[in-house]
Amino acid sequence: MLKADPECGIAYWGIALSLLLNPHVPTPAKNLAEGAAAIAKGKSVGAKTQRERDYIDALAIIYVDHDKVGHLPRTQGYAKAMEQVAQRYPNDDEAQIHYALSLNASASAADKTYANQLKGAAILEPIFARQPQHPGVAHYLIHLYDYPPIAEKGLNAARIYAKIAPDAAHAQHMPSHIFTRVGYWQESIDSNKVAQRVAKEASDLHDQLHAMDYQVYAYLQLGQDGKAKTLLDEMPSVTGFTETFLVGPYALAVSPARYAIERGDWKAAASLEVRPSPLSQVQAITYFARALGAARSGNPEAAKVDIAKLVELRDKLQGKDAYWSEQVDIQQKVTSAWVLHAEGKYDDALSAMSAAADAEDKTEKHPVTPGVPTPARELYGVMLLDRGKPTEALVAFEATLKKEPNRLRAYVGAAKAAEKSGDAAKAKEYYGKVVAIAANADTTRTDVADARAHLSR
């Protein structure tokens, strides 16, 4: 475009927009600097129409003071500006689409009414009905519905999107956001297998790792640990990506943590190596897994060392990224509760674990991940069960399943809690769920064998 018309202001807008990468994730500093220069150039050369100038001015807001102001406040400013553009041009579908996306990217993780998300979806659904092959609309609807209470609304867009763009890795991956939310594990695997292949062919390293992370998580929910391990062993061979962009580094940190935690291999979790990363929230994942593993292996002193690192990383994030600072704080709360448990301070441990679960329930998982390393509410159920409180544990496991359907460990916990609390009907139901979900699980999953044994009695 610029070769044909070096004075095309909207072309510079397009460059600046592309440099943001994923608006749900903080943009690397290098991209922000280049994007700010592009949008400034777009302003200086001018645009052909007032509409184009409005687009440029709105996007410019996300680049203002990018080296001083955090990602979320700038994104919220952009959303307000795009609202004005959308109102000014009500018949401009692209203005409506960009505004809808900005509503999701700027939403507060603490808002459980999902007001922004539902507003954005209400804008896009009529456009999707008119333009069912519009890739942006399908894509953004998936993001807008990527929340537990409203995820099923996104199934239509999820099933259509991959067919619209078969050669785009991200398009092949995105349906799995919804499949994960509703617990369709095999569908998530199938989606991400294609995404991984397409990303690898295109040398799209972040999308390749992202698809592998989602597959690891889904395989673990099916109890197919061997397939998860094969992917896990392959992931470190993917190199050369931008370390300051969250997607790739996050996948490399969280997948080994998941593999240990989901299998209850606490010694393996405690001995995980921390992969160097400039991103504090990425390092925190491994310190969390190490601390949890050490505490649950009966080594609270080792856990305390890793918890101290979590506190340090949380403090680094404070004032820079409120969302991730809070997530790391929750990780610190969870692991500290298990240290108390390991020290025999059971009442204090239960109180601390309950508070950690409450704190996590007030937030949302980030779009970069299929789920937190392990749900705090589920861990609270495990602790309650350990302390001989099966009725309360059952409530915790059922709450986990409401938020994260078809989680295997949550169903295992719910089945055991129901059995121990004397609820034979629920025990049978939940053991049946374990057997159904993990029908093709590896034989090393003893919980699945126990579930089959219970049902055969």
Q: Can you say where each PLM-predicted feature lies in the sequence?
A:
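Solenoid-like repeat scaffolds
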Residues: 1-4, 86-88, 128-130, 159-167, ...
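Inter-helical turn/loop elements of alpha-helical hairpins
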Residues: 4-5, 15-49, 57-73, 106-115, ...
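Amphipathic alpha-helical repeat scaffolds of TPR domains
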Residues: 7-19, 47-68, 91-109, 131-145, ...
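TPR/TPR-like (Sel1-like) alpha-helical repeat modules
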Residues: 16, 20, 30-47, 190-197, ...
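Residue at a conserved register position within TPR or TPR-like alpha-solenoid repeats
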Residues: 19, 61, 103, 144-145, ...
